[in-house]
UniProtKB/Swiss-Prot annotation:
Keywords: Cytoplasm, Endonuclease, Hydrolase, Manganese, Metal-binding, Nuclease
Pfam families: RNase_HII
Gene: rnhB
Enzyme class, spelled out: hydrolase
Subcellular location: Cytoplasm
Protein name: Ribonuclease HII
Length: 258
C-alpha cells in the first residue's frame, strides 16, 4: 500500500537535498495533494539554501580575520542619528566563530516583528555585548557625528571580553584596537548586523519609556523621527528635555546657537 499524503509530507519535511531520490519518486505520484506538498517543500529548501548562502556571504569580513588568527571580532553599529528626539544608541557585539543566525541582517531590513526573536538569539550566542548611549544634550554640545563616536567607544569599553579587531559601520574610531571601516557594514557583516539589531531594539524600548513621560509626541511609534504627529506636537506643546536643539525645525524654534 502506498504512503498517505500525510506520511509523504512528513518525509518531505526531513529532506534538505533537492536531488534526494524521494523527490523523483513522489513526482510520479499524480495526487494533487502530493504535487502541492512537493512544490511547497522545494520552495522551502530553495529559500533555506538562499538564506544559508546569504549568511555565509555576511561572514566574508570575519573569515578574512579568522585567517589571520584573529578570533575576537566586535561588530559595531549605531541607531538614532536622524531623529529629532532621544539618544543615539550604539552596540558592540562579539559573536563566536562562524556564527550564523537565521534572519540576521541590517535592522532596517528586518521586519520589526522579528527584532526581539533575533535579539534573543544574539544574546544567547554572543560572547559579549556592549551598549553605548549618548543623550540629546551631548549631541547638541558636540554634534551627532562626534556623539556617535563617543557612544561607540562606550559600547566597546563595556564589552566583558576585549576584542582583537573592530568591524565598524562607516566609521573610524580613535581607539587603540585594530579596526576596519565597512560602508553599509550592517548589511555586509554578521557582527555589525548583530550590533544593529541590539542597538535598534535598545533604542526602541527607550523611546517607548519616553512616550510614557511625554505621551503627546507619539514617541512609541515615531522613535523620535519628525513625523507629522510629532511636528504637530512640537508646535502645540514645545520641546522636551530629550529633543535635540541643534536639529531643525527645533533649532529655529528655540534660536539655538551651535
Amino acid at each position: 500500500m502506498g504512503q498517505t499524503i500525510k506520511e509523504i509530507k512528513a518525509t518531505l519535511a526531513k529532506l534538505t537535498d533537492l536531488s534526494a531520490k524521494e523527490f523523483l519518486e513522489y513526482e510520479a505520484d499524480e495526487r494533487a495533494g502530493v504535487q502541492a506538498a512537493l512544490k511547497s517543500r522545494k520552495k522551502q529548501i530553495l529559500a533555506e539554501l538562499a538564506e544559508e548562502a546569504r549568511l555565509e556571504q555576511m561572514l566574508e569580513f570575519e573569515k578574512e580575520l579568522y585567517g589571520q588568527e584573529i578570533q575576537l571580532i566586535a561588530g559595531i553599529d549605531e541607531v538614532g542619528r536622524g531623529p529629532l528626539a532621544g539618544p543615539v544608541v550604539t552596540a558592540a557585539v562579539i559573536l563566536p566563530k562562524n556564527c550564523k543566525i537565521r534572519g540576521l541582517n541590517d535592522s532596517k531590513k528586518v521586519p520589526k516583528s522579528k527584532h526581539h526573536a533575533i535579539l534573543s538569539e544574539i544574546q544567547e550566542k554572543a560572547l559579549a555585548i556592549g551598549i553605548g548611549i549618548v543623550d540629546a544634550e551631548k549631541i547638541d554640545e558636540v554634534n551627532i557625528y562626534e556623539a556617535t563616536k563617543i557612544a561607540m567607544i562606550q559600547a566597546v569599553s563595556k564589552l566583558s571580553v576585549k576584542p582583537e579587531h573592530l568591524l565598524i559601520d562607516a566609521m573610524v574610531l580613535d581607539f587603540p584596537i585594530a579596526q576596519t571601516k565597512i560602508i553599509h557594514g550592517d548589511a555586509r557583516s554578521a557582527s555589525i548586523a548583530a550590533a544593529s539589531i541590539v542597538a535598534k531594539v535598545t533604542r526602541d524600548e527607550m523611546m517607548k519609556e519616553f512616550a510614557l513621560e511625554f505621551p503627546e509626541y507619539d514617541f512609541e511609534h515615531n522613535a523620535g523621527y519628525g513625523t507629522a504627529k510629532h511636528l504637530e506636537a512640537l508646535t502645540k506643546y514645545g520641546i522636551t528635555r530629550i529633543h535635540r536643539k541643534s536639529y531643525e525645525p527645533i533649532k529655529t524654534m528655540v534660536n539655538f546657537k551651535s
